[in-house]
């Protein structure tokens, strides 16, 4: 089957069986300021297959996107059935692709690696429950949990990196989470760093970003994050990797 054929088949199957409505990848109910809303992840046109169910999709570049879809994507707020807010999400993904990517069906690398070459493998994958993208949480520690993590890329090897989007104390409209130092650009962190921030009880928070030796890293990198009334802020710090148990030394520090 040609790439175009696979794309059309996947899009048709998904829309017919799992999409809440045509082009709506996912919708979730949420309460904002006492009002019930429906938030939708909506494609502008039928999405194409991305990292389709094959063995190669279990490799590092596809981690978090395996068995997914790509296209032009927006996040939309509906109240009483009427659109009240919209944010274009494609702009936050790779400029080279100019497309947003979302995982559609979950991958199981341990089991899938041995089954990926079987003829009915793709059919079995598409019977799995869809991955829930909008998993709301309180990342800025100032809102009612109306933000969610959105993977926008991967880093070697297969580290999920992305942004958090939604509504925070900074603005009542849809927006990406930024920092006080750089309010004009989305804050990009690894998924485990966003999760640590969401679950943290005290500020500041020191998170290991890249350990010594990770893919040849000659320094150890930490992310220091603090939050308060002015929003989220912090720094990225690099330390030496001394031998023999000697203490690490700070060699570089940049604001987030």
Description of each model-found segment:
Residues 22, 125-134, 186-191:
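A short, amphipathic edge element
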Residues 82-138:
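A glycine-rich, hydrophobic loop/mini-helix early in the fold
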Residues 1-6:
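Bacterial N-terminal signal peptides that target proteins for export
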Residues 85-90, 174-183, 234-241:
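Beta-propeller fold detector
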Residues 146-192:
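Short helix-loop boundary/capping segments
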Residues 16-83, 190-256:
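Acidic, small-residue rich beta-repeat scaffolds with periodic aromatic anchors
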Residues 7-17:
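Hydrophobic h-region of N-terminal signal peptides that target proteins for export
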Residues 39, 138-153, 199-208:
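Acidic/hydrophobic-patterned starts of short beta strands in beta-sheet-rich repeat architectures
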């Amino acid at each position: 089957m040609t790439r175009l054929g696979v794309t059309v088949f996947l899009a048709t199957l998904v829309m017919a069986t799992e999409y809440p409505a045509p082009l709506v990848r996912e919708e979730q109910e949420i309460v904002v300021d006492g009002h019930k809303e429906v938030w939708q992840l909506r494609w502008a046109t039928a999405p194409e297959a991305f990292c389709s169910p094959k063995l190669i999709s279990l490799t590092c570049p596809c981690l978090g996107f395996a068995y997914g879809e790509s296209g032009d994507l927006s996040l939309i707020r509906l109240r009483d059935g009427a659109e009240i807010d919209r944010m274009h999400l494609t702009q936050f993904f790779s400029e080279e692709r100019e497309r947003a990517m979302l995982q559609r069906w979950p991958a199981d690398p341990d089991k899938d690696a041995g089954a990926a070459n079987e003829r009915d493998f793709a059919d079995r994958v598409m019977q799995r429950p869809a991955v829930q993208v909008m998993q709301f949480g309180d990342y800025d520690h100032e809102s009612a949990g109306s933000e969610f993590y959105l993977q926008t890329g991967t880093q070697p090897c297969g580290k999920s990196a992305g942004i958090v989007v939604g509504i925070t104390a900074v603005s009542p409209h849809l927006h990406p989470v930024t920092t006080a130092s750089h309010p004009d650009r989305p804050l990009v962190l690894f998924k485990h760093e966003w999760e640590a921030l969401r679950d943290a009880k005290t500020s500041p928070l020191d998170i290991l970003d890249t350990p010594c030796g990770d893919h040849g890293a000659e320094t150890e990198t930490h992310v220091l994050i603090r939050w308060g009334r002015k929003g989220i802020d912090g720094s990225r710090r690099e330390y030496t990797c001394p031998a023999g148990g000697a203490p690490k030394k700070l060699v570089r520090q940049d604001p987030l």
